[in-house]
């Protein structure tokens, strides 16, 4: 049975599934993983660690999306 946990994304309170990875979180948020950078608890989280890093209750994420243009 999966339980919900509370995390913060860009300063907002959100629910996440217990046992979800950061990559799962991005998919749930509908974000293109190729165009974002993630800070977890005040530290940059390298892209190769996204699939192995599990979200934990109380985690604070800042997710920045890159936008192209001219």
Locations of the language-model features?
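Ubiquitin-like/PB1-type beta-grasp interaction modules and other compact soluble beta-rich domains
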Residues: 1-69
